[in-house]
Design a protein with these regions (language model features):
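Primarily membrane-embedded glycan-assembly and transfer machineries that use lipid-linked glycans
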Residues: 1-163, 167-168, 197-325, 377-391, ...
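Aromatic-enriched
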Residues: 62-67, 337-422
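Transmembrane helix boundary and interhelical junction motifs in multipass membrane proteins
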Residues: 153, 181-184, 326-330
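Membrane-interface alpha helices of multi-pass inner-membrane proteins
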Residues: 168-190, 312-320
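Membrane-embedded alpha-helical segments of transport systems
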Residues: 178-181, 208-209, 358
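Membrane-interfacial entry segments at the cytosolic side of transmembrane helices
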Residues: 193-204, 344-350
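Hydrophobic/aromatic-rich transmembrane helices and adjacent perimembrane loops
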Residues: 325-342
Length: 422
């Protein structure tokens, strides 16, 4: 009943957020915070990949950080719809590929049905309905949709990993790693538990998928590995407004404070010392939380079930880096039932409630940034950029979630020691 109550509140908040965003779009002609400030860029995570899926120098000139599988998945969208890719830029390609995005939208709507079917034993009908609609209209879900990001496929394979064993689990890891490389962390439970057979199978499937998809796509597919390292080390890859749109990790604050535009500002001349100190502390906190969680899993691996290990690793992934993106919070949706079975279930569910709620409707700051073409309304409009409360609240709450699941692992060990003493 506690879980059902939280799900109802989360659904109500998600509906409020959806209505607010739609009303704002109809009245002002663009989406407010937390959606990206560049209103021309709608759906461009998908169409940037689409454009470069049909270019031969994606890994060399563009520096693509997407494994080959992502480009092949996008090509499948074009193949299914029969759309012939055309255009000399990704935005022109978007304008000529409406049926492709309609298919993406259908996949966005169907994916939660797929993983809910896999987890059907975990929910009653009313809870399943609530979880489904939260999964498609909550703020992180709408953010993923507005970006057109392929992460919307990931919850299906996380659920498959959760409810299946052995070969199916190895297959799930292989697909996830080849969609989003940070899922390589899912190898950790296999290593910690000494399940070398399944570890070898998972690595084999992952490498086979990487090599086969890369061979089909591009002879330089291996270049994605150095591209990923350079991507993560860049200090000015994104603008401050992009990073603060829907951050999920404390590392976003460190990135902002170390951004060249901040370092060269009048603010930095006045408060640079304090900014450096705060950025360093935040960076250490972010890294320390991740290391503590992984260390706890290693030390107390014998007392953690597969479900708890998966939860900890997914929470680590969302806290790992600002580059993971705020849409990574949708990875929590297929884990709701697991969170509900843990020691601190009530706290977890409340944290998830706030993480998916439209707290960004509360403005912290705003500035007029001029006129832009808004893709969603098809005209040029004046943009009043707003920094929403979610930019401050979500990374902090997500970090607290990371600390709490780490404590959960420690408590598993402590409980086991109590039983031994008895």
């Amino acid at each position: 009943m506690k879980r059902e109550a939280v799900l109802r509140v989360a659904l109500i908040m998600s509906v409020i957020g959806l209505l607010y965003y739609l009303g704002y779009l109809l009245f002002f002609g663009y989406l407010p915070a937390p959606f990206l400030y560049d209103k021309r860029d709608t759906f461009m995570d998908f169409f940037n990949v689409s454009y470069w899926a049909y270019k031969d120098d994606r890994y060399l000139s563009w520096g693509a950080v997407y494994p080959a599988l992502s480009f092949l998945v996008v090509k499948c969208f074009y193949w299914v719809t029969g759309v012939i890719p055309s255009g000399n830029s990704s935005m022109v390609m978007r304008d000529a590929s409406a049926p492709v995005f309609y298919l993406y939208f259908m996949v966005f709507l169907i994916s939660p049905l797929a993983w809910l079917y896999l987890e059907r034993k975990e929910y009653g009908f009313s809870q399943m309905v609530a979880v489904y609609f939260i999964s498609i209209i909550s703020t992180p879900a709408l953010f993923a949709l507005e970006r057109g990001n392929l992460i919307v496929l990931a919850p299906v394979f996380l659920a498959l990993y959760l409810v299946r064993k052995d070969a199916w689990r190895a297959f799930s890891v292989a697909v996830l790693v080849n969609l989003k490389p940070y899922f390589i962390l899912l190898f950790i439970p296999l290593v910690y538990r000494g399940n070398m057979r399944l570890f070898v199978i998972s690595v084999y499937y992952s490498l086979a998928l990487f090599v086969v998809s890369g061979t089909i796509l591009d002879p330089y597919y291996w270049q994605v590995i150095p591209n990923l390292f350079s991507f993560g080390s860049s200090s000015d890859l994104f603008s401050i407004r992009e990073v603060l749109s829907l951050p999920a990790s404390l590392s976003a604050y460190k990135y902002v404070l170390g951004h060249p535009s901040v370092i060269g500002s009048q603010y930095y001349l006045l408060y640079g010392g304090w900014a450096d100190l705060f950025g360093g502390v935040v960076g250490l906190m972010s890294l320390g939380g991740v290391v503590a969680a992984l260390l706890a899993l290693y030390l107390y691996k014998d007392y953690c079930g597969d479900d708890l290990m998966l939860v900890v690793l997914v929470v680590v992934i969302t806290n790992l880096s600002y580059t993971t993106g705020g849409y990574s919070l949708i990875l929590y949706f297929p884990l709701i039932a697991v969170f509900g079975r843990l020691r601190y279930a009530r706290i977890y569910l409340l944290l998830l409630l706030f993480l998916v709620s439209p707290v960004d409707i509360i403005p912290l700051a705003h500035s007029y940034i001029g006129e832009q073409y808004s893709y969603l309304c098809g005209r040029t409009v004046g943009i009043d950029w707003t920094l929403g409360a979610g930019a401050l609240i979500r990374p902090v709450l997500n970090y607290f979630l990371l600390l709490l699941v780490t404590v959960e692992v420690y408590k598993k060990n402590q409980l086991n020691q109590t039983f031994v003493e008895l």
